Amino acid sequence: MKLGLTCPRFTWPGGDSAIAGRFAAAARGADGAGLHSLWVMDHFFQIPNFGAVEDPMLEAYGALSYAAALTSRVTLGALVTGAVHREPGLLVKQVSTLDALSGGRAVLGIGAGWYEPEARGLGLRFPSLAERFERLEETLQIARQMWSDEDKPYEGRHYRLERTLNAPQARPPILIGGSGENKTLRLVAEYADACNFLHGADVRHKLGVLRAHCERLGRPYEEIEKTLHMRIPDGQSVAESVQRCGDLAALGIDHVIVAVPDAAADSSLAHLAALATQISAITPAGR
């Protein structure tokens, strides 16, 4: 079983001037602790679950590029990018650049997008849910085309590209976040290398739905990495964290991505190092 760290907050003692140093400590700490992955949210305003809207929030791909320069092992991705916030060609180029500069460690984490206040606040496109899913699917199609030898036009309902040239070439894994049964999990089965659920989802049921989509499409279910995001609260012991991860592995989760109260704290990184070591011996169900 794999362990990842997400950094959803950039609020540290010392204010804005402390962000670079503390985020660097989190990135280096995750890399040195034996974690598999490092993630940031792709938000422009802080979201309600993690703080006040006015709290500091870094742009995802700038932050990930900074982390890439400080690390050598962890994979790097946004958990997850709202597909409607960037033109698909630009997004694919950003992730391809991250992949090139990190030595092949980028992941495209993507979803339909949901946080309307930041979109309205910054004047970004925020169409209906149905259209956001249409744009997400077209973005996935464009990514696959740009990460192939098909240097040709793309024409969809919402996006038209005259030439899907992408050099340097890349093929980062695609992770789709969300648990919607009719649309999201169908897109996972058709386009993705990994899925991501939030803690609290009915994992057993959702994985059954995903398996059914895979069977219908002729996709091997085992090809897809199953990931889940959860929080580790203050005071939780390593043994308790191991138990939680083990319970998820028994359901078929391959990779747990955790948020901790302070991703740069020595105590948090020590907890994660111990957790990563212990769960590395766990084989998820179906593997």
Model feature map: region roles:
Residues 1-70, 172, 200-201, 266, ...:
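N-terminal beta1-alpha1-beta2 module of alpha/beta enzyme domains
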Residues 55-58, 62, 134, 179, ...:
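Residues at secondary-structure transition points
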Residues 31-32, 64-73, 95, 99-105, ...:
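Acidic (Asp/Glu)-rich catalytic clusters
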Residues 17-30, 91-95, 177-190, 236-249:
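Short, acidic/polar
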Residues 46-51, 78, 84-191, 204-213, ...:
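Internal, glycine-rich beta/alpha segment that forms the wall or movable "lid"
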Residues 7, 31, 36, 122, ...:
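An alpha-helical appendage that flanks or caps ligand/catalytic pockets
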Residues 7-21, 81-89, 130, 170-180, ...:
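Active-site mouth loops of central-metabolism enzymes
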Residues 3-7, 38-40, 75-78, 106-110, ...:
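Hydrophobic faces of well-ordered beta-strands that scaffold small-molecule active sites
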